């Protein structure tokens, strides 16, 4: 089961989140039938949103949009504070040549664009923030968002590793943040450790990458695990929700579906689930609108 572990240095100088998101990204790949580069780009976006959602309180919903002018198209993810995330990528078929080590490149092909976040607190006034894509690698773009929009300097690492058949082998990441009150000496020590950390791909390839991430982040410094919470890919779509959407259409449009298509098929963008509405279903909706 996927999980996020929240921790804090015993000194109180900084905190860290580490994630195992393997099942989340594997299920997203399965549902959307994504090829290698699309899988990694979508996976990184899902992991970034899992981190962002874990930083919120209450019943907030968080939307992350990675909008570039590349062949990937838009990448959209929605998460809640209960560990659930869903998402899709417009172009599922991007399969760009890998590096000599087999790693999938994303940044050089993302193009210009923006990292957009929408945090809905349920009050009717969602908070929206837009920052430019800095590298297109998504992790660095997420870190830039945290620094610019939330005024919280953060170190972010996230990635998706694929096997020889381009299926998800492992996915995960981390976030490290300096906390208020940290001394200059503690900040310098933290920055030095991050600079010396192995690459995220190397750490994810470890037998237990969650422990490997924690060890790389804290080194010999004592720390406390604050919580361990489950994560999952979960879509909240339903037949009832799409039926309500059909109710908003003009009667003429619904009648055209009956006359021309003998019904309607609606496919959820986020999970690919198909919902069928036959002629009788559509006629009932028309009658309900009367």
UniProtKB/Swiss-Prot annotation:
Record flagged with keyword Transmembrane helix: no
Tagged with keyword Chaperone: yes
Residue pairs linked by disulfide bridges in the UniProt entry: 235-237, 268-271
Gene Ontology terms describing biological process: protein refolding
Keywords, comma-separated and alphabetical: Chaperone, Cytoplasm, Disulfide bond, Redox-active center, Zinc
CDD domains listed in its UniProt record: Hsp33
Compartments in which it is found: Cytoplasm
Family annotation (InterPro entries): Heat_shock_Hsp33 (IPR000397), Heat_shock_Hsp33_C (IPR016154), Heat_shock_Hsp33_N (IPR016153)
Lineage: superkingdom: Bacteria
Any single GO CC term annotated in Swiss-Prot or TrEMBL for this entry: cytoplasm
GO MF annotations, alphabetized: protein folding chaperone; unfolded protein binding
Main location (coarse class): cytoplasm
Post-translational modification: Under oxidizing conditions two disulfide bonds are formed involving the reactive cysteines. Under reducing conditions zinc is bound to the reactive cysteines and the protein is inactive.
UniProt family annotation: Belongs to the HSP33 family.
Role noted for this protein: Redox regulated molecular chaperone. Protects both thermally unfolding and oxidatively damaged proteins from irreversible aggregation. Plays an important role in the bacterial defense system toward oxidative stress.
Stored NCBIfam families: PRK00114.1
The protein, known as: 33 kDa chaperonin
Species assigned in the record: Streptococcus pyogenes serotype M2 (strain MGAS10270)
Name of the gene encoding the protein in the UniProt record: hslO
């Amino acid at each position: 089961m996927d999980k996020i572990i929240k921790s804090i240095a015993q000194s109180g100088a900084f905190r860290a989140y580490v994630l195992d998101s393997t099942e989340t990204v594997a299920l997203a790949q399965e549902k959307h039938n994504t090829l290698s580069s699309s899988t990694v780009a979508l996976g990184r976006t899902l992991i970034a949103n899992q981190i962002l959602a874990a930083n919120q309180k209450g019943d907030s919903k968080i939307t992350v949009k990675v909008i570039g002018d590349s062949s990937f198209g838009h990448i959209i993810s929605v998460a809640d504070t209960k560990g659930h995330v869903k998402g899709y990528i417009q172009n599922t078929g991007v399969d760009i040549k890998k590096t000599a080590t087999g790693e999938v490149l994303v940044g050089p092909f993302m193009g210009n664009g923006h990292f957009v976040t929408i945090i809905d607190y349920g009050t009717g006034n969602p908070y929206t923030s837009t920052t430019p894509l800095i590298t297109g690698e998504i992790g660095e773009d997420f870190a830039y968002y945290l620094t610019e929009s939330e005024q919280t300097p953060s170190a972010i690492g996230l990635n998706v590793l694929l096997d020889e058949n381009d299926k998800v082998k492992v996915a995960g990441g981390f976030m490290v943040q300096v906390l208020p009150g940290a001394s200059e000496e503690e900040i310098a020590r933290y920055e030095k450790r991050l600079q010396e950390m192995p690459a995220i791909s190397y750490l994810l390839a470890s037998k237990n990458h969650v422990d490997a991430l924690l060890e790389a982040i804290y080194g010999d410094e004592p720390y406390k695990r604050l919580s361990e919470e489950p994560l999952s890919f979960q879509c909240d779509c339903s037949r009832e929700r799409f039926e309500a959407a059909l109710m908003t259409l003009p009667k003429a449009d619904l009648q055209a579906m009956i006359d021309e298509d003998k019904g309607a098929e609606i496919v959820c963008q986020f999970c690919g689930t198909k919902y069928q509405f036959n002629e009788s279903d559509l006629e009932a909706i028309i009658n309900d609108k009367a």
